[in-house]
Amino acid sequence: MKKHFEKEIDSRRTFAIISHPDAGKTTITEKLLLFGGAIQQAGEVRARKAARHATSDWMEMEKQRGISVTSSVMKFTYRDYEINLLDTPGHNDFSEDTYRTLTAVDSVLMVIDSVKGVESQTKKLLEVCRLRHTPIMTFINKLDREGREPLDLLDDIESTLNIQCAPMTWPVGMGKRFRGTYHLYSKELTFFDPEADRGTGQTITVKGLDDPLLDELLGSQVEELRNDVELLEGAAHPFEQEAYLAGLQTPVFFGSAINTFGVQQLLDTFIEHAPPPQPRETETREVFPYEEAFSGFTFKIQANMDPAHRDRIAFFRICSGKFTRGMKVRHIRLGREVQIANATIFMAQDRTNVDEAYPGDIIGIHNHGTIKIGDTFTQGEDLKYTGIPNFAPEHFRKVRLLDPMKSKALEKGLVQLAEEGTTQVFRPLMGSDWIVGAVGLLQFDVVMHRLEHEYKVKATYEPVSYVTARWVTGEKKKMDEFEKKEAMSLYRDGEGNLAYLAGSQWRLDNTMENWKDIQFHATREHS
């Protein structure tokens, strides 16, 4: 029994893909699902104007804009491994949702556009991985286009992201001259053939770079490959498993996701080298996946995944023990026992009921408003998983309702959307206006769109003169005094926490100076 339990855990690989918008993240997601047999045909994203939309972009607004605005989870099996792939929003503005998704994975795949190199969003996301020492594997995409020199790209990754690169494959040419890749460790040459099934022509094993067979196969391009690899041997780092697992080194693959080329090499290396479920920190101790008692945490709430059901799903990462359908668990924040009768697993839009699940798995728990982001569930022990933050918003808008009869629906919509963590809502201590706060501007459009389509509420925004927010705490007597004096700038967020909204950085600094006994917080752990 124990052996089976451990085997199940060891076969799990839970990871997310990070990239800058348009680097090819959705495409590579689909190709991975193709190899896992989870989809039959890649819903080519650029054909999204046709009837089929990329499998992982399922919300109406994403379909219209062609960007992933919500993280979704996809599970598939490949070579006896159970793979949980968390898709993250590729758009600049969704850093908060992406950040929380990165708390639920054990490793990350970074996709880089060979034409553009490292871009701002990738840099931001990598800093988050760095905080958690998350292992990172890299796929340099779009080799079928004229891009930057491969050595130049490695240098860009190393200097910009401050991480060692260990190339695993090496491209032969690029753009119109792209012939394929040479595997530096298995000594295999794989040919690129856009007409062939999955973009991959034959793979030929050679006896190293001096093999005369290479001259026959590559003609004039063989010297270029030999020179590159010779340079690499002096300049690049050999792959070291320990350095990769510590987040200090990234193995690098080259390919063309749109042509499915290089994706299988990446996947084969990934399942063998990426870590299985890892131990997790709680406020009191470290929890190990092999512990028998079940535990885990919610990292995301998604409303209305199925318009027919008007439902809310809590995305839950299992950290220890085994989940079985109908089991009773303790909801730590509420201090009460609940039964999880109908948990689901995801394949983007498709959901199936789950009978059992193991550490590393992401399950969906139906939620009628009682589960919040960051909630811990256990089989009794009083644990609280840490590191799932809310960020202080940087942009604010006042919501003006167009139909006064809809104020209840507006409140319901705003509170539910805030629970998902996409935006934050604030109600003033004095007055009744709703203020929406967001980390990125695109989130305002998402809120309006979803209010109208999912809650049937028509509203508009009005500008407000706030630039930043801080959650405030302190001892009761001081807080009472602070509330009285600063009432015009004080708001309660969706969870009832007190927040101070400032019209300028100077105003915030000044208030903090005047109220030294009050603590001002730029982030807040989900309570």
From Swiss-Prot:
UniProt binding sites for GTP: 19-26, 87-91, 141-144
GO terms (BP aspect): regulation of translational termination
CDD domains named among the record's database cross-references: RF3 (cd04169), RF3_II (cd03689), RF3_III (cd16259)
Family annotation (SUPFAM superfamilies): EF-G C-terminal domain-like, P-loop containing nucleoside triphosphate hydrolases, Translation proteins
Compartments, as annotated in UniProt: Cytoplasm
Alphabetized UniProt keyword annotations: Cytoplasm, GTP-binding, Nucleotide-binding, Protein biosynthesis
Gene Ontology, cellular component aspect: cytosol
Signal peptide: none
Alphabetical list of InterPro entries matching this protein: EF-G-like_DII, EFG_III/V, G_TR_CS, P-loop_NTPase, PrfC, RF3_C, RF3_dom_3_sf, RF3_GTP-bd
GO molecular function term, any single one: translation release factor activity, codon specific
Domain annotation tr-type G: ranges: 10-278
Stated family: Belongs to the TRAFAC class translation factor GTPase superfamily. Classic translation factor GTPase family. PrfC subfamily.
NCBIfam families the UniProt entry points to: prfC, PRK00741.1, small_GTP
Function: Increases the formation of ribosomal termination complexes and stimulates activities of RF-1 and RF-2. It binds guanine nucleotides and has strong preference for UGA stop codons. It may interact directly with the ribosome. The stimulation of RF-1 and RF-2 is significantly reduced by GTP and GDP, but not by GMP.
PANTHER family named in the record: PEPTIDE CHAIN RELEASE FACTOR RF3
Listed name of the protein: Peptide chain release factor 3
Lineage, uppermost ranks: Bacteria, Pseudomonadati, Thermodesulfobacteriota, Desulfuromonadia, Geobacterales
